[in-house]
């Protein structure tokens, strides 16, 4: 029996979500459109198989084929990032980070990460996260120019003496200097951990410098700029570290891995290894730069004054309206973004003084500079007259027509 026949409620909602994704312009920087073949393998019989352990070292029988699948995913991941060891089992980026901490740290150890309000991530030591509850966390941020001051990071590291320094961000538009971070880590005897969840797709295409060989350990998600399934990975060049990481993931924080998702990761990695991927990643950066240029020309402030990657962070510290106001208004105009804190934040995390806008998903739909120029101008049109609902409706209709020129899925399930 088909899903449509058996469960009309879920079938209907899934297809409404397809309609939303097709009609709206998805510009949340952490979201992307994965490949139909990734979704196809995730809907396969692999979802039935338990496979606790690792390839050739399982606690269940009948794993001969999933062993091969996981090994393919591991090998492709290592080739992508140019590393020696990879764990492809983490169910998410947050669990990957939890696995890293479990492998390298003891409860109460000190970590130094990027402040959440300056572009960091919850799992980099925020007090509301287990990373901030289990470990003593300290933070670095950005200067008034919106950029990391590595001399200031070094000063903080020398004062706090962390056991681990975390580099990487969820809302930082500039390139990260992993080499400089390693110099700082070495100066205080700390491990260097890079969370490249947001920039991984650029890294593997050569559009952002690689955390290897500078970092002791690297984590990432497999969605976002990699366009694979939702999940996490951990990588290192050190065999002893790899053993600790494996134990930290299983049996440390996870049981049986999601083999259908690991297969999806393998398929996604094959896309990432292609020549077409390099073209895509380059276009992601080009589109983000065009987006930023237009917004600046329209009078909007970008944190750091531009972008080196896939996102721009727009600050409304000098505006009467908030990030939440902008999020809602743009949503009414058919543009999906997210409210975001900015350096110098004066509002609560539920209101914020900025928005984060990304290019990966629309680039996946085939849009280029001309489309991004148009969209950026429409974003500015909405923000210039933020309470004008009739203008928002008019722009929504215009952008729906644009979206329908770049349909990425013709059905909701594969």
UniProtKB/Swiss-Prot annotation:
Could you say which residues bind (6S)-5,6,7,8-tetrahydrofolate here? 116, 120-122, 240, 348-350
The molecule here is called Serine hydroxymethyltransferase
Question: GO molecular-function annotation terms?
Answer: glycine hydroxymethyltransferase activity; pyridoxal phosphate binding
Cofactor(s) the protein requires to work? pyridoxal 5'-phosphate
Q: Which UniProt keywords apply?
A: Amino-acid biosynthesis, Cytoplasm, One-carbon metabolism, Pyridoxal phosphate, Transferase
GO terms of biological process kind: glycine biosynthetic process from serine; tetrahydrofolate interconversion
Cytoplasm recorded as keyword:
yes
Q: Which Pfam families match?
A: SHMT
Site Plays an important role in substrate specificity: which residues? 223
Q: What does this protein do?
A: Catalyzes the reversible interconversion of serine and glycine with tetrahydrofolate (THF) serving as the one-carbon carrier. This reaction serves as the major source of one-carbon groups required for the biosynthesis of purines, thymidylate, methionine, and other important biomolecules. Also exhibits THF-independent aldolase activity toward beta-hydroxyamino acids, producing glycine and aldehydes, via a retro-aldol mechanism.
Subcellular location(s): the record lists:
Cytoplasm
Q: Which residues carry this modification: N6-(pyridoxal phosphate)lysine?
A: 224
In terms of InterPro entries, this protein maps to:
PyrdxlP-dep_Trfase, PyrdxlP-dep_Trfase_major, PyrdxlP-dep_Trfase_small, Ser_HO-MeTrfase, Ser_HO-MeTrfase-like, Ser_HO-MeTrfase_PLP_BS, SHMT-like_dom
Q: What is catalysed by this protein?
A: (6R)-5,10-methylene-5,6,7,8-tetrahydrofolate + glycine + H2O = (6S)-5,6,7,8-tetrahydrofolate + L-serine
Q: Does Amino-acid biosynthesis count among this protein's keywords?
A: yes
Per the record, the pathway is: One-carbon metabolism; tetrahydrofolate interconversion; Amino-acid biosynthesis; glycine biosynthesis; glycine from L-serine: step 1/1
EC numbers for this chain: 2.1.2.1
Query: Which family does the record claim for this protein?
Result: Belongs to the SHMT family.
Q: Name one GO cellular component term.
A: cytosol
What PROSITE patterns would the database entry show? Answer: SHMT (PS00096)
Identify the enzyme class.
transferase
Q: PANTHER family from the entry?
A: SERINE HYDROXYMETHYLTRANSFERASE (PTHR11680:SF50)
């Amino acid at each position: 029996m088909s899903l449509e026949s058996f469960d009309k409620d879920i079938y209907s909602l899934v297809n409404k979500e397809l309609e939303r994704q097709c009609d709206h312009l998805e510009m949340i920087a952490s979201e992307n459109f994965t490949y139909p073949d990734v979704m196809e393998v995730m809907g396969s019989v692999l979802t039935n198989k338990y496979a606790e352990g690792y390839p050739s070292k399982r606690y269940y029988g009948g794993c001969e084929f999933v062993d091969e699948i996981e090994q393919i995913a591991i090998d492709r991941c290592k080739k992508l990032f140019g590393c020696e060891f990879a764990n492809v089992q983490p169910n998410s980026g947050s669990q990957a980070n939890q696995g890293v901490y479990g492998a390298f740290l003891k409860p109460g150890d000190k970590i130094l990460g990027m402040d959440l309000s300056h572009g960091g991530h919850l799992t980099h030591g925020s007090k509301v996260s287990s990373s901030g509850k289990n470990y003593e966390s300290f933070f670095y941020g950005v200067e008034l120019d919106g950029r990391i001051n590595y001399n200031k990071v070094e000063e903080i590291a020398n004062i706090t003496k962390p056991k681990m320094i975390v580099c990487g961000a969820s809302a930082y538009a500039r390139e990260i200097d992993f080499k400089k971070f390693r110099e700082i880590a070495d100066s205080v005897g700390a491990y260097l951990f890079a969370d490249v969840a947001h920039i991984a797709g650029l890294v593997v295409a050569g559009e952002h410098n690689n955390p290897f060989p500078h970092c002791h350990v690297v984590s990432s998600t497999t969605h976002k700029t990699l366009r694979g399934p939702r999940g996490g990975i951990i990588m290192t060049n050190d065999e002893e570290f790899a053993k600790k990481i494996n134990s930290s993931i299983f049996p440390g924080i996870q049981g049986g891995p999601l083999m259908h998702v690991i297969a999806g990761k393998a398929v996604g990695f094959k896309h990432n290894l292609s020549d077409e991927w390099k073209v895509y990643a380059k276009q992601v950066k080009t589109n983000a730069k065009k987006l930023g240029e237009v917004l600046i020309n329209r009078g909007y402030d970008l944190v750091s004054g531009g972008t080196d990657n896939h996102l721009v962070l727009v600050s409304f510290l000098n505006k009467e309206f908030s990030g939440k106001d902008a999020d809602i208004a743009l949503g009414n105009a058919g543009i999906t973004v997210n409210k975001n804190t900015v350096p110098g934040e004066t509002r609560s995390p539920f209101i914020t003084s900025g928005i984060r806008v990304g290019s990966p998903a629309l680039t996946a739909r085939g849009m280029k500079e001309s489309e991004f120029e148009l969209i950026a101008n429409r974003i500015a049109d909405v923000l210039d007259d933020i309470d004008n609902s009739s203008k928002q409706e008019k722009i929504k209709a215009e952008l729906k027509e644009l979206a329908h020129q770049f349909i990425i899925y013709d059905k909701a399930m594969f």
